[in-house]
Structure formats: structure tokens, C-alpha cells
Amino acid sequence: MLELIVCRACLGCACSFSFAGLGMIAQRIFSPAGFAIAIGLGDSALGIGGVIGEFGVDYFGERLGWREIMLATALIGVPLAIGCAWSLRSKLFAQIQSTKEHDTIPATLTMTRQIQSVLKKREVILAVLIYGGTCGMIMGFGGFWNIPLQEAWGWSPHESVILNSVFFIGTAIGAPIAGILSARIGAKKLLIVGVVISILSYIFDLMFPPQWIMTNVADWPLWVDCVTMFIIGFGLGTSILAFPIATRVVAPEMVGLTISIVNFSGIFFAAILQVAPGVIIQGFQDTTLIALQVGHSVFVLGMLMALAATLCLPSHTQTAHI
């Protein structure tokens, strides 16, 4: 058990480093608007990976053991990651020199002081809350709790996997679109629209089961719930705008740290939102539909936190044009 925990922790660290590295490279190559698109494409890849993982485990789970599946993914992922890193130009990994516009050279500060200087920015704090509520929903709901909820509605395990995969497809499509539109519409407006439609769609899926809505129809079509899942994921795709919101107010040499802080918030809240529903459900005598509904209410609270933080953003919050 200890070995498994250590391996999972190392895997999580590797993923965190890779996302921060992606942000740093994108910030050096692209304009602010291009940075938003690049982060959106990176998050889109995460959504596509979620879809592949869902279908892969569903298909190979009955044919192979979990060890074999993990080994196969490692054999594919490790050389792929090494090849991607090797193909990048070395200057993209060079240290960013601070500009003379700043009184204090961040390189001379301790890590604690650097974190404090970043967290003094109001937009960074708001971005942390935005990404915490939205990424926590994506990882907590899509990463675990969606399938038990769909099975409680009466869908088969295979149909529940399809619904969860459609949720990740929505995030994969919504993230790059949010990055593209942020230069024209503005990050704040996009976030408000995205989070609101996700909240409303999620409440609809949570509170109104097919048996209640269509009491006179024996077969509730799967595609209707697929549309709902897609809308939820699509709206949450705007979560990537938290990164350009946070990084545009810090010095270039602080971008990597800022991305790491925002990303930490998303993973931290994801961990909380994976545990919290289970703690609530344990208060019930059995895992009934009502227990799952009550447990899933924490995801609504997370998205409401993100919405409240978005509303507190300055009205001029907008990514620069490409």
C-alpha cells in the first residue's frame, strides 16, 4: 500500500511540473492572447486524455489487470514526454532575467517571499479561487463521482462511462474556445457565462432524474443526458482563463510560480471535492440516490465560489489581442 501511495504521489508531482512547464513555455513563445489559447489547448489535451482513459479502462479493464494497464500507459507516456522535452529548443528553458522596472530581483528572494509577493496581487487570489472551484469540479466530479451518480439514475456502467466521457469532451472543446474568445469578449464575461451555464446544467442533472421528467416514457434517451454532460464540461472549459488572469499582473520571471500556485489550488480543491461527498454520504445509512444528491451538492458550492470570485474581478479584465 505504501509503495502505491508513493507512486501516486510521484505521478502527481510529475503532472504538476509538466503543467507549470507548459505555461512557462507558452508565456515565452506567445502573446498574452496566444498564451490563453495555448493553456486552453493544454487543458484540451487533458480532457482528451480523460476520454481515452475512460474508454480504455472500460474496454481493457475486463481483459487486463490494473497493473498491466498502468504499465502500458507508462511505457507509452514516458518516451512520449522525453521526446517532447527533447524536441524543444534549449533557450525555452533558460532563466528569465528580471527587468530594471522592478525594484527587487525575484531571484534574490527566498521562495516564501516570492510566494508572498505573488499572493499580494488581488487578481492572483481571485484566480486561485476561480480555478479551485472549477478544476475541483472537473477532477472531483469527472474524476470519480459522476459515474456513481449516473448509475444511481439507472444507467448501466457502460452508459455511465459514456456520459462521463462526454463531460470530458465538453471540457476539451470548451477550453481552447475560451482561450480564443478571451481576446474579444474578455475573460470575466466568458467566465461568468461558462460557470453559470455549468451550475444550471449540473443542478438540472443532479435534481431531475429521467424517471421524474418523463414518467410516461419508458426509455429516456441517453443523448439527452449526454447533451447535459457536454454543456457542463463546456462551461467549465473557461476555467483555463484563471491562468492568463493571474499571470498578466506579475513580472515575467514570476509567471512559473504564479502558474504553479493557481494549479495547486485546482488540485487542492479537487482532492477536497473527491473526499467531501464521501464524508457526507457516510452520514446516510446506505448509498441511495438521495444520499448521492446531497453529497454532490458540494460541487455546486465549489462552482458558486468560482462565480463569486469572478464577479469580484476588475471590469477591465481582458486578455490582450494577439
What is each residue range found by the language model?
Residues 94-126:
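Juxtamembrane intracellular "pre-TM" segments in multi-pass secondary transporters
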Residues 174-186:
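Helix-to-loop junctions at the C-terminal end of transmembrane segments
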Residues 122-175, 273-278:
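Extracytoplasmic gate region of multi-pass secondary transporters
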Residues 7-45:
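Cytoplasmic helix-loop-helix junction between adjacent transmembrane helices
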Residues 183-196:
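Cytoplasmic membrane-interface "Motif A"-like loop-to-helix N-cap segments
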Residues 42-93:
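Helix-loop-helix hairpin linking two adjacent transmembrane segments in secondary transporters
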Residues 2-10, 223-231:
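Paired small-residue
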Residues 197-218:
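C-terminal ends and interior cores of transmembrane alpha-helices
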